[in-house]
Amino acid sequence: MRSDMIKKGFDKAPHRSLLKATGLKDEDFDKPFIAICNSFIEIIPGHKHLNEFGKLVKEAVRAAGMVPFEFNTIGVDDGIAMGHIGMRYSLPSREIIADSVETVVNAHWFDGMICIPNCDKITPGMMMAALRINIPTVFVSGGPMAAGKTSKGEVVDLSSVFEGVGAYQSGKISEEELKDIEDHGCPSCGSCSGMFTANSMNCLCEVLGLALPGNGSILAIDPRREELIKQAAEKLKILIERDIKPRDIVTEEAIDDAFALDMAMGGSTNTVLHTLALAQEAGLDYDMNRIDAVSRRVPHLCKVSPASNWHMEDIDRAGGISAILKEMSRKEGVLHLDRITATGQTLRENIAEAEIKDKEVIHSLENPHSEEGGLRILKGNLAKDGAVIKSGATEVKRFEGPCVIFNSQDEALAGIMLGKVKKGDVVVIRYEGPRGGPGMPEMLAPTSAIAGMGLGAEVALLTDGRFSGASRGISVGHISPEAAAGGMIALLEQGDIVCIDVEERLLEVRVSDEELEKRKKEWKRPEPKVKTGWLGRYAQMVTSANTGAVLKIPNFD
């Protein structure tokens, strides 16, 4: 066993002595040592319950004849961090999480790992670590939150609360109505109830094969989560015995299938960023062109909030992720069904018994929302290396209008609230990319303000930053190269006409090449917003969004 490095041989007497101080007995040194990578954090509702959850995981590991050791990672709640400097720490926290898991697991020579993530950057951070460490691993997330209901019986979620702020600001609802939405938008523990980033990544984790069937959709408060825990411990033991590791599971074909589900469900645009980062950790050459190819061949079968009023509980009731995959498998060339997963079985075997139980929630191949996926990659003179739009969350497929330019999210939000944005405008928020932000903050507050003011279909928004999975409307993010790297978005001027064509996958500014070249020569890189601490280091090392915004090793030659 891998853990023999710290427990076998006369020279490991000091190690065993220390381990006995934690409660181990001599007989435990013949069993696999399992890292329980938890993320219990009281300020994050998606993680509030994970303390008790972790205890259940440890019990299941012991029952399977292995020895559990629990530790916790940090985490950032994107909703609470939204709209202030806290959001700059969100994406960078993914790297800290990956590094911290790598540190604990490699320092102590564990034989296997069970990861307990749930919310936005915590799931991909742990997934990156699992691929980097590459020991047998199973993921069991904390599960989605249920949707809420206002006193009037209206179904609401966190997206409703953010949009309620814009609606109140524009006089569409009263303060009492906003308070009602606030009180009921997040009714329980769990990851926010729509197809936002957390749930998108937990669903993708299931498709990739790192998590068990049901992981993406079974609610946090559902007793079936406990059954998943028991299965996870049993399956991990099999993975250890068969020496099946994350890099055996997460192949290019597995990533294709993850994006196929993403397209079928119209997941968060953040999935593109995180899954590209996973590919980097797995040593795979996977780019946005391949994502676009997946988008072109996968129909959009399922709309979940913010694209509709359906939530993860409805997906679960309708058959879960397995039912969506089973339907997709009917179309040739969409899924790779014979690859191995964390169950020890193939994807084909995992979904064999699945079926759609509600065709209003999960559409059939014969009745898709659209013939192509719910996410699309746009390119053009404004995004040479690509940009992303959640096409399934807007009915507008072509938009052209003059730019209203803001050089930060704070500046943009103030401008929107002051009425500086009108019907037909293209709002540009730049210098908010991985390097420029720094940290590539999410733009949920501006998009929600626009939607709440009733302009969601009449105003477009472009940014080199990110969008929350709760964002909707004509929102194009991840524009690469970013402004801080001298990308074309930095060269835009007030009033420039920008064209967004979702069907043709184009993002262009109606300015001549000669004029753009002239502006580029005159452009000067602004001073970094942050020069010290973790964010200062991050800004110097982070790569572009089109490569996953991962950290690069500085070249000292």
UniProtKB/Swiss-Prot annotation:
Biological-process GO terms, alphabetical: isoleucine biosynthetic process; L-valine biosynthetic process
Active-site residues, Swiss-Prot/TrEMBL: 468
Cofactor binding, per record: Binds 1 [2Fe-2S] cluster per subunit. This cluster acts as a Lewis acid cofactor.
Keyword terms, alphabetized: 2Fe-2S, Amino-acid biosynthesis, Branched-chain amino acid biosynthesis, Iron, Iron-sulfur, Lyase, Magnesium, Metal-binding
Cofactor needs: [2Fe-2S] cluster; Mg(2+)
Residue positions binding [2Fe-2S] cluster: 119, 192
Gene Ontology MF terms in the entry: 2 iron, 2 sulfur cluster binding; dihydroxy-acid dehydratase activity; magnesium ion binding
InterPro entries: Dihydro-acid_dehy_C, DihydroxyA_deHydtase, DiOHA_6PGluconate_deHydtase_CS, ILV_EDD_C, ILV_EDD_N, IlvD/EDD_N
Enzyme type, top EC level: lyase
PROSITE patterns: ILVD_EDD_1 (PS00886), ILVD_EDD_2 (PS00887)
EC number from the UniProt entry: 4.2.1.9
Matching Pfam families: ILV_EDD_C, ILVD_EDD_N
One Gene Ontology CC term in the entry: cytosol
The keyword Nucleotide-binding is assigned to this record: no
Pathway the protein takes part in: Amino-acid biosynthesis; L-isoleucine biosynthesis; L-isoleucine from 2-oxobutanoate: step 3/4; Amino-acid biosynthesis; L-valine biosynthesis; L-valine from pyruvate: step 3/4
SUPFAM superfamilies: IlvD/EDD N-terminal domain-like, LeuD/IlvD-like
Domain of life: Bacteria
Residues that hold Mg(2+) according to the record: 78, 120-121, 442
List of residues that carry N6-carboxylysine: 121
Keyword match Magnesium: yes
Reaction(s) the record says it catalyses: (2R)-2,3-dihydroxy-3-methylbutanoate = 3-methyl-2-oxobutanoate + H2O; (2R,3R)-2,3-dihydroxy-3-methylpentanoate = (S)-3-methyl-2-oxopentanoate + H2O
Described purpose of this protein according to its UniProt entry: Functions in the biosynthesis of branched-chain amino acids. Catalyzes the dehydration of (2R,3R)-2,3-dihydroxy-3-methylpentanoate (2,3-dihydroxy-3-methylvalerate) into 2-oxo-3-methylpentanoate (2-oxo-3-methylvalerate) and of (2R)-2,3-dihydroxy-3-methylbutanoate (2,3-dihydroxyisovalerate) into 2-oxo-3-methylbutanoate (2-oxoisovalerate), the penultimate precursor to L-isoleucine and L-valine, respectively.
NCBIfam families: ilvD, PRK00911.1
Family: Belongs to the IlvD/Edd family.
Record's subunit section: Homodimer.
Name this protein carries in UniProt: Dihydroxy-acid dehydratase
Name of encoding gene: ilvD
